[in-house]
Amino acid sequence: MSWKTEEVESHIPVMLKEFLKHCSPKRDEQWIDGTFGYGGHTTALLDKGCKVLALDTDEDAQKRAEILKEKGEEFYFFRKNFSEMAEACFQMGWTAVDGILLDLGVSLGQLKDPKRGFSFQFPDAPLDMRMDRTRERTGAALLNTLSKEQLVQLFSVACNMKESQKLANEIVRFRSTGPIKKVGDFLEIVTRARLLKSKINAATRPFLALRIAVNEELEHLEKALREGTKLLKGGGRIAVISFHSAEDRIVKEFMRSHCLPKKGEGVAEEENHREMFFYKVERVLVSLEERKNNPRSRSARLRIAWKIPLEEKSGL
């Protein structure tokens, strides 16, 4: 039986081939898909015979999951952030899992929906940017209420210090004449800030920084890495697909700092106190073919870490 729905068939999951090749999910394994979205990675796991517990905060993702749940009993969905995976596993009675996948960032559906305010392609849209619309804080609310110093800190996640200061100054100037409400208001602020020219649209990095702040994405990622690692069985793997340097830096540092050194390598003094969870870490870049067929994937990178088997860990 194929688990794919019509909507999943039309969606292209990022780095799916690489994920399946390097993680090798097997029949009857228990997997967590922390970012269900359109269900592309989940259905691939189900087609391999895995049991899948999926999470997503988006109500549209929940509707897609309900359709998938009608197909069988190997799929379970929770409308929660992936940082709450331990709680979801507890509710399911899952004490440990074979694998975890996190496909970070905003989905194509969220970007294309004008009401969500994620894209600068829709200037008349409300500046919302919430992945979970039950949350109160919108992008507009943050820009209207944060202090100048807090705004500089917000934008420094994706912009350099000079650009962050320019943006903060223009936001304070703009809101002195009236509240920021629409995507177009933020675009006007970016234009006034006269950021340094680059190959990408000048609004790309400011929009990214604001979205990260609205959804507390980096905080949730750090918690998910800690909690997820505890849930992994010995030999289990955690795979994270990231799209920008702030995310990737967190994933890289977490996996590297908790991985056994390679043969012949020593351990830095500051790392002696850290518990080692992993015996192997890999980085996989997106293929040229996928970059050509799916431009959204051009900045994607996949990092995978394998947990130390219990028998090996007991001998450390």
UniProtKB/Swiss-Prot annotation:
Q: Give the superkingdom in one word.
A: Bacteria
List the signal peptide residues: none
Q: Specify where it is mainly localized.
A: cytoplasm
Q: Where does S-adenosyl-L-methionine bind?
A: 39-41, 56, 82, 103, 110
Asked if the keyword S-adenosyl-L-methionine belongs to this entry, the reply reads yes
The family database entries (InterPro entries) matched by this protein are listed as: RsmH, SAM-dep_MeTrfase_MraW_recog, SAM-dependent_MTases_sf
Does the entry annotate any disulfide bonds, and if so which pairs?
Answer: none
- GO molecular function terms attached to this record: rRNA (cytosine-N4-)-methyltransferase activity
Enzyme Commission number(s) from the entry: 2.1.1.199
Q: What reactions does this protein catalyze?
A: cytidine(1402) in 16S rRNA + S-adenosyl-L-methionine = N(4)-methylcytidine(1402) in 16S rRNA + S-adenosyl-L-homocysteine + H(+)
UniProt KW keywords: Cytoplasm, Methyltransferase, rRNA processing, S-adenosyl-L-methionine, Transferase
Q: Which SUPFAM superfamilies match?
A: Putative methyltransferase TM0872, insert domain, S-adenosyl-L-methionine-dependent methyltransferases
Write out the function statement from the record. Specifically methylates the N4 position of cytidine in position 1402 (C1402) of 16S rRNA.
Give the family per the record: Belongs to the methyltransferase superfamily. RsmH family.
Protein name according to UniProt: Ribosomal RNA small subunit methyltransferase H
Species of provenance: Methylacidiphilum infernorum (isolate V4)
